[in-house]
């Protein structure tokens, strides 16, 4: 499929539900690349795109049957906070930060909210 790094931003429905990233990752089960790319905002360029371990910044709600649903607003806000240094910052190339910010920010704009700026 596509290359690694930031996953192209897309518009989707959004949700204000409480966020549980671990549960949503678990619900993905053994999903393949096309499903994983719908749930996350970044993929390791050297990783296996068919494994969850190659992905970061999950922000979509995932049903128990593995269906990727709306982008979760809290997850998008948290992801941008990590890009800006929260929880030790993001362990991704500096050149990928803007693309991930754009992806997460688009979902927040879909929800009618303005994302925090990306800090240098």
Residue ranges with predicted function:
Residues 1-120:
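Extended terminal accessory/targeting regions
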């Amino acid at each position: 499929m596509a290359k690694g790094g930031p996953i192209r931003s897309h518009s989707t429905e959004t949700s204000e539900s409480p966020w549980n990233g671990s549960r949503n990752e678990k619900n993905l089960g053994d999903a393949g690349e096309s499903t994983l790319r719908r749930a996350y905002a970044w993929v390791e360029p050297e990783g296996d795109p068919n494994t969850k371990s190659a992905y970061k910044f999950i922000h979509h709600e995932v049903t128990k049957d593995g269906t990727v649903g709306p982008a979760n607003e809290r997850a998008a806000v948290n992801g941008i906070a990590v890009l800006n240094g929260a929880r030790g910052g993001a362990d991704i190339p500096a050149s990928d930060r803007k693309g991930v910010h754009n992806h997460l920010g688009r979902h927040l704009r879909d929800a009618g909210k303005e994302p925090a700026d990306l800090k240098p």
